[in-house]
């Protein structure tokens, strides 16, 4: 069984948890309007995805 033999110190616990980081979102430019967008998503500015308009932007 996975039972700890000794108490885990604060330093050891914090060293282990130091790897828990949030990554910045990867951004690419939209080929239609050249605004930054998340890849494989519909562009929030123009509504285009994969070379065609899928959302009507007013």
From Swiss-Prot:
HAMAP family, alphabetized: Ribosomal_bL32
Keyword Ribosomal protein: yes
Entry keyword annotation includes RNA-binding: no
Entry similarity comment: Belongs to the bacterial ribosomal protein bL32 family.
A Pfam entry, by short name: Ribosomal_L32p
One cellular component term from this protein's GO annotations in UniProt: large ribosomal subunit
Cross-referenced InterPro entries: Ribosomal_bL32 (IPR002677), Ribosomal_bL32_bact (IPR044957), Ribosomal_zn-bd (IPR011332)
Gene: rpmF
GO BP field: translation
GO molecular function: structural constituent of ribosome
Keywords, comma-separated and alphabetical: Ribonucleoprotein, Ribosomal protein
This protein's name: Large ribosomal subunit protein bL32
